[in-house]
Amino acid sequence: SSTLLTVYKKNDFKVLSKSCDSEENPFIENMLQGYNKKIFLNKYSMDGGKSPQKLIAVSIYNKINKDPVLITLHSQYWCCYPLSEGTIYSVNLYKIKNSDSSFKIIDITSSLGTGEQGLDGQNDVGENFVFKLKDIASIKKWLDKNYK
């Protein structure tokens, strides 16, 4: 599948997402395409959950006088003791640098610290967890405060 994005002008980029649903090792892989160029973004495999990883949201964050940021949000459902039960969310952030009819990306996910991934549900000993960055609006609020 593909998602059109407006980074510098209308629909100038797209995220291409392909998934392999093999029983042995399902995965999802994402690329950013623009200016006749494709760049690998990320790849997620099953990682022990009950269902394969899903790319649930893609967006661009713009801040005046700053490079745009591509946001990707993945989720995976986990279930049943002795595992945690709920949804694991994974956030990726990429700064997009424009240069001479080309572009490059810089992975800035580490700026989230431990907040780049988390459980929204219950762990194996019954403690409840709420992951705060499980939607684009929450991620953009975080970027409003922290993207310098």
Model-derived segments and spans:
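Acidic, small-residue rich beta-repeat scaffolds with periodic aromatic anchors
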Residues: W78-K148
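Beta-propeller blade termini
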Residues: S1, T6, P52-K63
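Structural motif
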Residues: S2-L5, E23-M31, Q76-K95
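Terminal domain-start segments
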Residues: S1-G49, E116-K148
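Acidic/hydrophobic-patterned starts of short beta strands in beta-sheet-rich repeat architectures
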Residues: S1, N11-L16, Y61-H74
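Residue-level signal for glycine
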Residues: K37-K38, P52, D100-F103
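A short, structured loop/turn motif at beta-sheet edges
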Residues: S59-V69, K95-S102
